[in-house]
Amino acid sequence: MTFETISVTLEEGKTLVFETGKIARQANGAVLARMQETWVFSSVCAATLEEPVDFLPLRVDYQEKFSSIGKTLGGFIKREGRPTEREILTSRLIDRSMRPSLPNRLMQDVQILSYVWSYDGVTLPDPIAICGVSAALAISDIPQINIVAGVRVGFINNTWVVNPTKAEMDVSRMELVLAGTEKAILMIEGHCDFFTEEQVIEAIEFGHKHIVTICKAIEDWQKQIGKEKNTSAVVPLPEQVQTAVNTLVEGKFSDLLQIKEKKAFEAASKQLENDIVEKLQEENEIFTPLNIKTAFKQAKSDYMRSLIRKQGLRSDGRSVTTIRPISIDTSFLPRTHGSCLFTRGETQTVAVCTLGSEAMAQRYEDLNGEGLAKFYLQYFFPPFSVGEVGRIGSPGRREIGHGKLAEKALSHALPDPAKFPYTIRIESNITESNGSSSMASVCGGCLALMDAGVPIKTPIAGIAMGLILDDDHVTILSDISGLEDHLGDMDFKVAGNAEGITAFQMDIKVEGITPEIMQAALAQAKSGRQNILETMKATLASPKTDLSQYAPRIETMQIKPNKIATVIGPGGKQIRQIIEEAGVQIDINDSGLVSISASSPQAIEKAKSIIEGLVGEVEVGKIYEGRVTSIVPFGAFVEILPGKEGLCHISEFSKQRIENVGDFVKQGDILPVKLLSINEKGQYKLSHKATLSE
């Protein structure tokens, strides 16, 4: 293969370049995509499946090499291994962008690998990776329905910006990553600062305009150098199988859908499927169990769609806008800082809020350096939540993605860290699942925050919207169930308060949807969100005014940066002494902000007093509660601040004459003294009798 390259300019200074033919020439497709000095290499490979499967076996792995910034990993192991959270989230973005563009019943195992080989700290790599993967897929022989591209959109200084720089994203009020084709949107993921539905659509349309430009460039490149597609890898379902299955299920789905409980419905549905497989699999070689099951799934989807289109009724009997019954139980757990049992239909979470000091913050390291997350939400999806047996271990990609979406949704409602200096951890423990568990995590997490006494700006709720798209007939569903997610065309999650949006995520199974459909879905989502918020407010209208008795107390104080070393002491000796003496936890940042946490206000005050003593400057004329450190014939030395002591002469103890200082005070006594003066040598002159008249 010869070396080939194309370029596409999005805005001035933002030119995306694709190269192929020099690297990884044995892959089905391989592209080096670059913008400025951020270079991302992507490859796609396919292998024929040994056994046909009823799903698309697509695997995506994105990795950020630390060598791309001239560094190696810290610690003993220097080789990149377990993916970071950011790498997992980007892998999901690529997967969700590419999956709708691959044909159903593609009988190939497809693997996508994407590596950041060079990162300039300016141009963010994930949209480049999406485009690079799409270009590699386009020029490969792997079948593809449509060419895809992806961009990031930011909102900086009231202006939409495509593929903003790292510095621009740090001040952007929105982060939106979207992917699509020339004609439609396939995937969106983002969060924003209470934007309206109109603003979100405006951002999507702005981003899609640039997606069209990239798609056209990749399409032209494909026509010039692309391999012939291996269409034999796509095995359509024989019409004879679908017809036979449709005949056998006729009239039976109406009885099946009378079963409202999820597990009972699934059992009955599985039994019906098995009966049909048993009846048909001996017909001839095309009636394989896989083909029959695929046809059964299609027949079930067709019936559900027909029911919605003709009667406006869903599989569980709801109308298209009806939300499942909600029940809420706050302060559900007695010893946690805040908790909520949130149930919506057959989806349920036990959400828990835990407050702590900076020591509880989540530390991370990526190409942009080390960071500290003082708010994070962790989502747990144990197998019992769907009545199954499964592994327990490190979180899967789905758990990471759902947790991050809920975290972003709630993050915009958090109080100013300067006024509420706590690290906040929310865990969402999914105990039942029948659709929309990530949005249940938003609702339950918000109520747990309020139950913990976190002064959030506004309550946040989330809802998942679905879509049934048949020819020109569009039906939008509110609060979709697991079945509607499985058989429908869209899963569009939207979170926010009553007026604005804070987070959103959309995945589709069709070839794309238009901004007009998304606009209708967002409008219906707003109505549903407001309905859920009213239910939440009926249980807990506002955050509790007091923290839990089991939550630590945290206060902050500001010291001069040049005094940080004084508080820490040689080898940390001084700060360890304060922690031990006062019974507190202390964190100090580079600006001199000191965070003190303890179980009691008294312990915090003691620590503050010690620190103030260490960093405080003595003032002439000020009275101090000093400690007698030693007694001499002519007076006593008194420590007025840690490390700062002066002489209280025998004549300064009393208005009456005294003969022996030892008769008046003992070493270790607390003695009020007034600082009279500081001589040229920096020595302090103290007086006790000067305090007697004050």
From Swiss-Prot:
Involved in mRNA degradation. Catalyzes the phosphorolysis of single-stranded polyribonucleotides processively in the 3'- to 5'-direction. This is Polyribonucleotide nucleotidyltransferase. GO terms for molecular function: 3'-5'-RNA exonuclease activity; magnesium ion binding; polyribonucleotide nucleotidyltransferase activity; RNA binding. Signal peptide: none annotated. SUPFAM superfamilies: Eukaryotic type KH-domain (KH-domain type I) (SSF54791), Nucleic acid-binding proteins (SSF50249), Polynucleotide phosphorylase/guanosine pentaphosphate synthase (PNPase/GPSI), domain 3 (SSF46915), Ribonuclease PH domain 2-like (SSF55666), Ribosomal protein S5 domain 2-like (SSF54211). PROSITE patterns: KH_TYPE_1, S1. Belongs to the polyribonucleotide nucleotidyltransferase family. It is found in: Cytoplasm. Its EC number is 2.7.7.8. It catalyses: RNA(n+1) + phosphate = RNA(n) + a ribonucleoside 5'-diphosphate. It comes from the Bacteria. Residues 621-689 form the S1 motif domain. The gene is pnp. GO terms for cellular component: cytosol. Keywords: Cytoplasm, Magnesium, Metal-binding, Nucleotidyltransferase, RNA-binding, Transferase. One of its GO terms (biological process) is mRNA catabolic process. Its cofactor is Mg(2+). Coiled coil: none annotated. It comes from Chlamydia felis (strain Fe/C-56). Its main location: cytoplasm. Residues 552-611 form the KH domain. It is an enzyme of class 2 (transferase). Mg(2+) binds at residues 485, 491.
